Amino acid sequence: MLSSSFARNFNILEWQSKEICAKYNVAAGINLVARSPEEAAEAFRKMNLPAAVIKAQVYCGGRGKGHWLETGFKSGVHFVKSADEAAKIAKEMLGHHLVTKQTGKDGLLCQAVMLSDPVEVKRELYFAILLDRQTQSPVVIASTEGGVEIEEVAAHHPEKIHKFVLDGVEGITEEVAKNISTKLGLTGKAYDNGVVEMQKLWKLFVGSDATQVEVNPLAETTDGRIITVDSKFNFDDSAHYRQKQIFGYRDLKQVNPFEIRAEKYGLNYVPLDGNVACLVNGAGLAMATMDVIKLAGGDPANFLDLGGAASEAAVTEGFTIISQQSHVKAILVNIFGGIVRCDMVAAGVIAAFKKVGLKVPLVVRLEGTNVEAGKKLIRESGLPIISADNLTDAGEKAVKAAKGEKF
């Protein structure tokens, strides 16, 4: 149900999303972050309320139904009624790994907790704005079945999920918000507040360059308020130059170090689980290359887009990153020379091969500007580079090379 786009993005923690909500005046309650049991106790006292909800801050959903790897302690969401209890629960969470359906068996390390004011919930709703590849538009996904995983609702009660395709410029207008509120069964004060909050969430989506704004649950309270109780935001990596606050949240310890290294050279790198590595110029061609590898019976080991940076330094760095992945058994370089000349890329590939000292088979397919000059350089290099005549041939040779076949 969520975004089908391959766009690179990163997640932020819930407490960080609450700060962004505050920036756009989205109603999200009182929220304080703590990184030690003592800070949790102090946060509880500062809230000056008879009770609070304490939540583990990790990059995953399903925290309430999770468990802690080291101790078996249940749940990453607890209700506490005193500062001492807040400290006790924080101690169970901090420094431990929370395992949920979304984390895998090793779980995720919790380094912070968030204390929030309890909300007297009348109904839990689901609300998300995301980019939809099928319609090539932003869409809203809304449901009266909030507080549970939306995939489960889609599987068992698809009729309870409503999809609204938005105008990319106008977004959630008052009219659209009223339509959504009606579908969610909001009435009276809750209806009016729902219309306002949905428009604020659209402004947040656009203003923060988000690729996904998911609120689950979006709570209708007993007194008619509409509150963003739990939220998950994703942001387009390409917006880093104008979203300084948001990208300042980025925890580099949670990011693959090779992705960080690639960024320094203007490369777009996403690790995958296969054994045929790709080094391509252009995101569209990179996707097509991965498809060809799959069609040939293989699995891509990465998405690596040189973009317009197909220089010797960029190619060398790409090879360096790829060659350090032990699961890579072959590399496929697929270049279409437009602005970038094939002879320049060929020279870069040859120099990079020698500098890195590649130990795995290398398949190269060149097409476009100065392609014959590029192919000549590769032929005369004396290196064991496997040339491919077309995209299909390249994919087949790369998969065979990964299996140990000789050419």
From Swiss-Prot:
Predominant location: other
SUPFAM superfamilies with a match to the protein in the record: Glutathione synthetase ATP-binding domain-like (SSF56059), Succinyl-CoA synthetase domains (SSF52210)
InterPro entries on file: ATP-grasp_succ-CoA_synth-type, ATP_grasp_subdomain_1, Succ-CoA_synthase_bsu_CS, SUCC_ACL_C, Succ_CoA_ligase-like_bsu, Succinyl-CoA_synth-like
Domain of life of the native organism: Eukaryota
Annotated residues for binding of substrate: 281, 338-340
Binding residues for Mg(2+): 216, 230
UniProt catalytic activity: succinate + ATP + CoA = succinyl-CoA + ADP + phosphate
PROSITE patterns: SUCCINYL_COA_LIG_3
E.C. number: 6.2.1.5
Entry keyword set: ATP-binding, Hydrogenosome, Ligase, Magnesium, Metal-binding, Nucleotide-binding, Transit peptide, Tricarboxylic acid cycle
Cellular localisation: Hydrogenosome
Keyword Nucleus: no
GO biological process: succinyl-CoA metabolic process; tricarboxylic acid cycle
Cofactors: Mg(2+)
Subunit annotation: Heterodimer of an alpha and a beta subunit.
Primary role: Succinyl-CoA synthetase functions in the citric acid cycle (TCA), coupling the hydrolysis of succinyl-CoA to the synthesis of ATP and thus represents the only step of substrate-level phosphorylation in the TCA. The beta subunit provides nucleotide specificity of the enzyme and binds the substrate succinate, while the binding sites for coenzyme A and phosphate are found in the alpha subunit.
Protein name, entry field: Succinate--CoA ligase [ADP-forming] subunit beta, hydrogenosomal
